[in-house]
């Protein structure tokens, strides 16, 4: 697995949520690049800071009315495209 900074992990997860709102699908796709522990920790942090909200038991959504989606750095674009 490639090592990402904590900020890069957060950005990756936010953009992955935009691509896959279903939490189960999201976690399966992200497991190819991050550990499940990192994924869960970042999702919990994003929910706690209100950058992501849970809609029902299985759907995650970026809370773009509360905070803008961060710009995707060039080094992460191919990673998101390949998810």
Task: Give the residues covered by each predicted segment.
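Minor-groove-contacting beta-hairpin "wing" of winged helix-turn-helix DNA-binding domains
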Residues: 58-67
